[in-house]
Each structure stands twice: as structure tokens, then as C-alpha cells.
């Protein structure tokens, strides 16, 4: 009998979404979750995302698609742009969950996760880094 895989994915939603869009694509989050489960045996997928009140329907959809959404309050700037960087939350949650998973997948091309990747490698807990855009990612993740 095959051992049930117990790998978790930690997803930088902003990095994923922006890099997919910059390539002219729109990500189907529901199918991406299925892909993570079927291809990599991901039992839990944590999605780190800035919280915007008007996006409640999106968050409900993501939850129904089997993501565990971790929200960060966003800041709105005078020019109308919003900022909700979730890097610290992703690192912290990955370390909090460490005893609960076999291996982690990090979905991001952001070099801010270099120290996390190094730590997971030292603990033999890194399954893979999924980089949304192979042509545009931090050299720190090579």
C-alpha cells in the first residue's frame, strides 16, 4: 500500500498571480490546487494573500477550492494602489507547520525566501520550489 503523502504547499499569491499575468496567462486557482495534489501529493495548500474587503467572493472561492487562506491586512496608498506583502507570514507559517508535514513546496520566485529555503534544505524538509516565471526570478533561489 502506498504511503499517503503529507506535503504542504506555501504559496506567495501575489508573486504567483503577477508572474502568471505578466506572461499573458490567467491562473485557474481551482485547477492549480488539483495539480498540486495530484502531481506533488500536497495535502494542504496555504495561500498567503492581502485582504481586501471587496474580494470576499474570491476568498470564499479559494476556500472552496481547498486552499487555506492566510490573510494580511492591506495598506491603501494615496495613489490608489494597495500593498499587502505576506512574505513574513509565509515564512512564519512554514516554520510553525514544520512538525506537521513531511516536506514543503514553496511557490514563489521571490528571493526574500532564500533564508527559508536554506533552512528547509538543512532540515531535509524542502520538496521543491515552484517558480511561476522561469525567466524572471531571484538568483538567490538558484
Question: Which positions does each model-derived feature cover?
Answer:
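Domain-level signal for Mg2+-assisted phosphodiester chemistry and nucleotide/NA-binding surfaces
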Residues: 1-86, 121, 126
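Residue-level detector of intrinsically disordered/flexible regions characterized by low predicted structural confidence
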Residues: 4, 87, 135-136, 142
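Short, well-ordered alpha-helical scaffold segments within catalytic/effector domains
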Residues: 29-30, 87-92, 114
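Internal catalytic-core helix/loop-beta-alpha segment
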Residues: 80-109
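Active-site histidine-anchored catalytic micro-motif
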Residues: 101-141
Amino acid at each position: 500500500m502506498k504511503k499517503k503523502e503529507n506535503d504542504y504547499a506555501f504559496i506567495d499569491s501575489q508573486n504567483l498571480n503577477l508572474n502568471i499575468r505578466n506572461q499573458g496567462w490567467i491562473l485557474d486557482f481551482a485547477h492549480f490546487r488539483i495539480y498540486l495534489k495530484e502531481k506533488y501529493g500536497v495535502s494542504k495548500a496555504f495561500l498567503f494573500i492581502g485582504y481586501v474587503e471587496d474580494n470576499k467572493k474570491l476568498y470564499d472561492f479559494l476556500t472552496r477550492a481547498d486552499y487555506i487562506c492566510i490573510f494580511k491586512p492591506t495598506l491603501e496608498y494615496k495613489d490608489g494602489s494597495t500593498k499587502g506583502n505576506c512574505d513574513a507570514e509565509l515564512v512564519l507559517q512554514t516554520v510553525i507547520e514544520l512538525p506537521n508535514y513531511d516536506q514543503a513546496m514553496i511557490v514563489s520566485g521571490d528571493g526574500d525566501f532564500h533564508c527559508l529555503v536554506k533552512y528547509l534544505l538543512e532540515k531535509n524538509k524542502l520538496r521543491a520550489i515552484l517558480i511561476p516565471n522561469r525567466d524572471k526570478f531571484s538568483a538567490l533561489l538558484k
